[in-house]
Amino acid sequence: MLVDAGMSVGFHTLDHPVLTQLPDAEVSRALTLGRGALAEAVGAGITLFAYPHGRVDSRVASHVPKAGYRAALRSGQRPVGPTSNLFLLGRWEPGPLGVRDLIAEAALRLNYPIGAP
């Protein structure tokens, strides 16, 4: 239903470990264990990943494309441009505002009226 409505669904691991504290084999396992079940549940492939706790280093980031993801998000609102590393993208977090307020704020910052085509 979400995917049919144009939403993207990403994976975030099953048990939310701090990946930077895990050995390589466990990082690889965390990136894949449960991903298939999520893909089946949403009826679409899962190609986006969000690092648990927003914590990532170059070693962990190197595992993500090997696991078949196209991009990954970490904590922190960072600008994204044509030369941005797709596996170290910042993400906007709703925080205390909530999703509805976050969307309205983003629309204002982009000077894009809500409900516009």
Predicted regions and their residues:
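C-terminal active-site subregion of NodB/CE4 polysaccharide deacetylases
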Residues: 1-4, 8, 17-117
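A short, exposed helix-loop element centered on a Lys and neighboring polar residues
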Residues: 12
